Amino acid sequence: MASSWFFIVFLVLTVASVRCTTVDHMPSTDEDARDYSKLKTKTEEATDEHHSRTQQAKDELKSKADHAANEVKSNTQQAKDRASEVGKEAKEYTESWTEWAKEKISEGLGFKQDDDPKGSVEKAFDSVADTATKTKDKLQDMASGAGEYSAGKAKDMKDTAYKKTDDVKNAAKGKSSEMRQATTEKARELADSAKENANTAYIAAKEKVRDMADRTSEMTNEAQERGARKAEEAKEVVAEKAEGAAEETKKKNEERGESLKWAKEKAKQGYDAAKSKAEETIESAKDTIASGYESRSRNHKN
């Protein structure tokens, strides 16, 4: 009896083994592990690629931001240098006008810059007075030494000489006063002209500096806006690249997920088919065994 059951079990196993060769091949545990390892490797590669692209986009953004900052710094320094040059030009222009005014005053008065106008006028007055005195003395000598003239004629000549001497002195005083007044007026006119020219030059330089300052501010604002635009563009590029990499990674993961799902379904179908075949084989074996047992029982009775 025990040998009969052993034979039955051996027969069932043999039939099941033969039947299994007719169905689809079932993936083993090692194959599942290899598939999982491949899937994991591809996922890691996709993740590394995503990280690499993200880092590359960050580096590009940093490079563009640094370039924009350097450009803003360069434009600001250029504007500062230009403003300094304008201030220097304005100073030189003002000094040039002042020097020109001094020279014109000296030329208008007829003496050099290092001469004293008041001293020159006094020297001219002293020269005229000295000439008048010498003329008076000479006339007195002529009056006293002219014996052929009468006393009256001599007196008239003396009086005339005195009168002419006084006229010369008065004329010299008047001329000196006129020269002094003319000199003062000329000096005042030249000083006013120099002051006006210097003021004009100062106003022009001030306007030029203001215009340059406005231009500097405008250039700085433009550079800042340009830098902001470039940074925003770089940021958008980074976002687009990151989004594209994420979508690509998601797509690959979905494709791998579908492949793994298909493999699992295929394995399940193979397992179900094998199980069904095995059950059919067992039932058939049971029927065969039962028929053989009944046949032996009938033969034994007979």
Curated annotation (Swiss-Prot):
According to the record, the residues making up region (Disordered) are 25-93, 168-193, 205-302
Query: Would you kindly state one Gene Ontology biological process term found in this protein's UniProt entry?
Result: response to water deprivation
What residue spans carry the Basic and acidic residues bias annotation?
34-70, 79-93, 205-286
Top-rank taxon: Eukaryota
Describe the family membership recorded for this protein in Swiss-Prot or TrEMBL.
Belongs to the LEA type 1 family.
What exactly does this protein do? LEA protein are late embryonic proteins abundant in higher plant seed embryos. There are two subsets of LEA proteins (5a and 5b), the first ones are expressed when the cotyledon weight reach 80 mg and the second set are expressed above 100 mg. The function of those proteins is not known.
Q: What else is known?
A: This is a SET 5a protein.
Protein name (Swiss-Prot/TrEMBL): Late embryogenesis abundant protein D-29
Q: Say which species the protein is native to.
A: Gossypium hirsutum
